[in-house]
């Protein structure tokens, strides 16, 4: 069963609509092709006379570059909403947005960007207190289930584990189409902004490191070991990993610890926001049942979904992994900012799991859920 150009209602749609006007500028971050333009266009449909500017279009960019505050106000006057898509392409976008906010207190602007390191550098300082940030990720299980029903997602779980959930890939009609789309996306396209803005001198070395990281999903990583294998310095590895985080391609998970003598407290794990991208990076989109790395893919899929869910729900919590010095471990632990552990999850493709006794002793009030192929969709779609 393949979706046929489904229209997905994005979880943050209502939140964005409610926040327009509360702050002059809303900034929507997300990777390339994640659905930002589709989302802002559906927001625009609720307004009478919106203005849409495409930062990728030199004509649109020139319209607002190098203008005075008064000129910018004249350009957007008469429009009840202004959208600047791919705003990182507009020269001095932070100054442009600041001038609008300074000169039109009731401005209603949405700026989108696929490279937060660039847009954030240009936007954060000039707009302190006057902007609200939103993040858009590949389609979540919740969004997919709302569009086509949880049963369809359950029946096609292995497709999502192989190809991920970027909208165009979720909508592709054949397996072959999905393979070619995910390969194209995981090629230079997704990294285009990184090569443009990230100061990456050697794209070949960068891509080698990304592949090494993709092969280590779910394992604790050694930056020194990665540096040695990629033939670059440890500092460059750290810089590249930060760039991957800032482009919404990958993220680090840190360990939870309250007792340094019993629990590990320094190492990191790395995961990808989309398992399809991860699989394409290592050149393997084979069905999950045939794969030796199915446990790592399944774990990555669940953890990325929990990251999306936390972001969309606005929960003020921390997500970590846990391991003690004797080797007992848990894939994901969510805790409040005060360090109070709320819930622990262990991912097992088929078999079930129990809470490790050392964890239970340290965190007696935490709930524990074993996530398997049979309960993952209900766990993610219905909670």
Name what the model sees in each region.
Residues 94-117, 124-126:
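Conserved catalytic/switch belt of AAA+ P-loop NTPases
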Residues 117-132, 148:
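Short regulatory helix/loop adjacent to the ATP-binding pocket of P-loop NTPases
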Residues 57-59, 114-119, 139-142, 257, ...:
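Conserved nucleotide-binding/hydrolysis micro-motifs of P-loop NTPases
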Residues 1-5, 137-311:
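Interdomain hinge/linker elements that couple catalytic modules in large macromolecular machines
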Residues 1-7, 18, 23-27, 31, ...:
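A cross-kingdom feature that marks ATP-driven nucleic-acid transaction machinery
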């Amino acid at each position: 069963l393949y979706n046929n150009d489904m229209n997905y209602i994005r979880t943050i749609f209502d939140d964005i609509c409610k926040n327009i006007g509360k702050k002059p500028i809303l900034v929507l971050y997300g990777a390339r092709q994640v659905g930002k333009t589709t989302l802002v266009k559906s927001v625009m449909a609720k307004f009478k006379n919106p203005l849409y500017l495409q930062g990728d279009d030199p004509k649109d960019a020139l319209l607002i570059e190098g203008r005075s505050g008064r000129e910018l106000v004249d350009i957007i006057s008469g429009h009840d909403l202004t959208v600047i898509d791919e705003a990182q392409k507009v020269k001095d976008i932070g100054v442009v947005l600041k001038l609008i906010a300074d000169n039109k207190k009731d401005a209603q602007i949405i700026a989108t960007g696929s490279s937060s390191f660039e847009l954030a550098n240009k936007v954060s300082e000039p707009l302190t207190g006057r902007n609200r940030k939103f993040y858009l990720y590949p389609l979540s299980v919740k969004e997919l289930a709302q569009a086509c029903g949880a049963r369809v997602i359950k029946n096609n779980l292995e497709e999502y584990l192989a190809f991920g959930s970027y909208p165009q890939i979720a909508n592709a009609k054949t397996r072959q189409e999905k393979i070619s789309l995910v390969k194209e996306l995981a090629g230079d396209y997704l990294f285009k902004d990184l090569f443009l803005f990230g100061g990456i001198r050697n794209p070949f070395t960068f891509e080698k490191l990304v592949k090494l990281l993709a092969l280590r999903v779910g394992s604790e990583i050694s930056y020194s070991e990665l540096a040695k294998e990629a033939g670059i310095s440890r500092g460059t590895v750290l810089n590249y990993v930060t760039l991957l985080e800032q482009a919404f391609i990958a993220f680090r998970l840190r360990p939870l610890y309250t007792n340094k003598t019993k629990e590990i407290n320094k190492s990191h794990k790395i995961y990808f926001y989309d398992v399809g991208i991860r699989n394409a990076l290592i050149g393997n989109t084979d069905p999950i049942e045939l794969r030796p790395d199915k446990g790592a893919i399944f774990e990555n899929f669940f953890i990325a979904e929990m990251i999306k869910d936390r972001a969309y729900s606005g929960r003020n919590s921390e997500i970590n992994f846990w391991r003690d010095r004797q080797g007992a471990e848990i894939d994901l632990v969510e805790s409040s900012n005060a360090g109070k552990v709320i819930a622990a999850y262990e991912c097992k493709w088929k078999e079930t799991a129990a809470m490790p006794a050392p964890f239970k002793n340290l965190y007696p009030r935490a709930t524990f859920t074993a996530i398997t192929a049979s309960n993952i969709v209900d766990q993610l779609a219905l909670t």
